[in-house]
Structure formats: C-alpha cells, structure tokens
Regions:
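Beta-sheet-dominated interaction scaffolds and their linkers
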Residues: 17-40
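Exposed beta-strand and adjacent loop surfaces of beta-rich binding modules
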Residues: 38, 50-54, 96
Length: 128
C-alpha cells in the first residue's frame, strides 16, 4: 500500500517543473581583483509562475558564506536564460560548498502557496 501511494505521489509531482542552473560542478577562475575568485553560472527558467531567483552560497552545514554578485535576486522570464558571475574571497573558498538559486514565489492574497524550488551546484567538486 505504501509503495502504491509513493508511486501516485511521484506521478503527481513529476509534471512540476523547476529551473535549471549549470554547470553542476563549476570551475573556479581568477578574477580581476586580487584575493577574489569568480564562478560563471547560467540559469534557465522553466516556470511560468516565477520570475525571480535568489542566489546564495553555503558551507557544508548550510550556513551562509559571504559572496558578491551584480544582483542577489535575478529576474529571469519564463523560457529564458540568464548568465551571471559570483565572486568569492579566496579565504572563503575552502568553506564554500554549495552555490544555490532559489525561486521567489510572489505572495498573493487568496492564493495558496506555490512550490519553491532550490537548485545547487557544488563548488568543491566531488569532495565529501
């Protein structure tokens, strides 16, 4: 019975689309500022109900790691791609594990909360 319920839930959830962020394991590149590195990323929006995505960097325990980017919240229209750069201090690079984008669902009166999605890329490669 439990397996059947799990299959029904998976079939119901499967059509829900999220967003895509590439690459999954980005290359760390030097930036034009000494002591700072750059990560080049790209995001594609599959969701017609979401236009904004927040960028975050986390350590292995999901604590925030300081970073800089042109916009901490990106506007990405439906079926469009947006390229962005994230800058980290070399001193924080060993701590930084995940670079994530989270969909920002617009709050509306009288409308039930929609699903928010978070996609993460791993900054330290395949290291555990």
């Amino acid at each position: 019975m439990l397996t059947r319920a799990a299959l029904i839930i998976m079939a119901w959830v499967a059509p829900i689309s999220a967003h895509e962020m590439t690459p999954a394991y980005p290359k760390i590149k030097p930036s034009y500022v000494s002591g700072v590195v750059k990560v080049e990323m790209s995001i594609f929006n599959y969701r017609s109900d979401v236009k904004y995505y927040q960028i975050n960097v986390f350590d292995a325990a999901w604590n925030s790691v300081p970073f800089s980017t042109q916009y901490k919240v990106l506007k990405v229209k439906h079926s469009e791609r947006n390229n962005f750069d994230v800058y980290l201090r070399k001193a924080d690079l060993k701590r930084a594990v995940y670079l994530c984008t989270t969909s920002k669902v617009k709050k509306q009166v009288g409308v039930k909360t929609l699903v928010s999605s978070r996609i993460c890329s791993r900054l330290n490669g395949n290291k555990p």
